Amino acid sequence: MSSLANKAKSKGKSSKSKSNVNTQVDELSDSIGLVVRVMTAVVDIKFDGGKVPKILNALESKKFYNGKKLVLEVSQHISDNIVRCIALDSTDGLSRNDEFIDTRAPISVPVGRGTLGRVFDVLGNTIDDCGPLEESKYIIKPIYSEIPKLTDQKIATEILVTGIKVIDLLAPYLKGGKVGLFGGAGVGKTVLIMELIHNIAKAHRGVSVFAGVGERTREGNDLYHEMIESGVINLNEKDQSQAVLVYGQMNEPPGARLRVALSALTMAEYFRDSENQDVLFFVDNIFRFTQSGSEISALLGRIPSAVGYQPTLAAEMGAMQERITSTNNGSITSVQAIYVPADDLTDPAPATSFAHLDSTTVLSRQISELGIYPAVDPLDSTSQALSADIVGEEHYEVAKEVQRILQTYKSLQDIIAILGMDELSEDDKLIVARARKIQRFLSQPFHVAEVFTGSPGKFVSLEDTVSSFKGLVEGKYDHLPEAAFYMVGSIDDVIKKAELLQKEGKV
């Protein structure tokens, strides 16, 4: 793919050649409607035959706009023969009395092995300039499906090892669980997601489905090329690829941004239910899903609720989140980047997401300002998996001791700022020294950031992580300099770095 900047061009090609919207209906008079009103992303269509389309049906234009057909989704019945629809692409060029056909089916997308290594838009059209899909390797499924029955769901108690120390030790992820990455702008949510995709594809050989919801086109392009370079996507043998990308980017209408997560989730559900796989489902960014819903809600004329969000916020979030679960066939482990407006966790958008999560990874601006990456807050991040029953007694005790030391250091910082280190007791001085080493040891070089940092990425096993921090809290490494703990992998790397610093006379 040359660039996702050419997306519109390739979308046009794929739409003309093969559309995934079911248009195989007789063009009877009662299935054709006329545009009577256009309000940017919301369009009113009149059906004179008296038979209006069902809610969530897709309507497709009879003519092309900017090289492709326009698809609308029915959202409201506002009279006996008029429906209000959400546009899933730009309405530029649309005018009154233009004709639309009721497809008599919801939006549908391709699913199956043929989707691996490809990039799609919300309608399931390929946008990567790699040609059409192989027809024998995919089927078409609607983006709306039932939530798995309670009897089919499985309780998740197995840890998903990410290779990232701060996560595996203090806020471990459950296989089949839902994880929220919380953070303001520019603290590293997308980089952390890219590293998780890289590590899990390499360590677990699992399929990842990535939903780009309302984020930058440049980031989507970077992620695609990073996956090619790391081998997650194999351009020569698509079947060997381990990821599917579905994008509804920042420049697209709110309808596309609202539905793209469901398109990607439908692809993930196929791998779980039909191929019995453990799937990783990444969403970047779940806040944009909420934001696009708010835009659509205002255009549809609904009365807003708190802070201007849509009154259906909790229902829309629940309808998507409840489909992300483990079943007897396989699991979907979801990692969702959640932008926090003005770093306010009480904002309704991130607050609504909290109820659905098993783990929260909070990215802190204060930690990123210290130059510690990933900038995960070890005290604010939580996980239901951090219990002795799931992670084991040793891991649990080490994690709690690390948190105790860091919490004590945090409570001493005001005293240090006012009176200085000399006024602390010897015990407190020791805790501060260990806490500063722990803080730096929680940093880690990432594989996906090698081109920026020049440092090779590190994948640290869970056993190494627990044993390294156990030695640290027990005081086995009190003699090593603080600088040796910064941006390394395991404790063996710390010892090597300490020896190097000593040779160079920097300690």
UniProtKB/Swiss-Prot annotation:
GO terms for molecular function: ATP binding; ATP hydrolysis activity; proton-transporting ATP synthase activity, rotational mechanism. Belongs to the ATPase alpha/beta chains family. One of its GO terms (cellular component) is proton-transporting ATP synthase complex. It is a peripheral membrane protein. It catalyses: ATP + H2O + 4 H(+)(in) = ADP + phosphate + 5 H(+)(out). InterPro entries: AAA+_ATPase, ATP-synt_VA_C, ATP_synth_F1_bsu, ATPase_a/bsu_AS, ATPase_alpha/beta_chains, ATPase_F1/V1/A1_a/bsu_N, ATPase_F1/V1/A1_a/bsu_N_sf, ATPase_F1/V1/A1_a/bsu_nucl-bd. Keywords: ATP synthesis, ATP-binding, Cell inner membrane, Cell membrane, CF(1), Hydrogen ion transport, Ion transport, Membrane, Nucleotide-binding, Translocase, Transport. ATP binds at G183, G184, A185, G186, V187, G188, K189, T190. It is found in: Cell inner membrane. Residues 1-22 are annotated as: Disordered. F-type ATPases have 2 components, CF(1) - the catalytic core - and CF(0) - the membrane proton channel. CF(1) has five subunits: alpha(3), beta(3), gamma(1), delta(1), epsilon(1). CF(0) has three main subunits: a(1), b(2) and c(9-12). The alpha and beta chains form an alternating ring which encloses part of the gamma chain. CF(1) is attached to CF(0) by a central stalk formed by the gamma and epsilon chains, while a peripheral stalk is formed by the delta and b chains. This is ATP synthase subunit beta. Its EC number is 7.1.2.2. Its main location: membrane. Produces ATP from ADP in the presence of a proton gradient across the membrane. The catalytic sites are hosted primarily by the beta subunits.
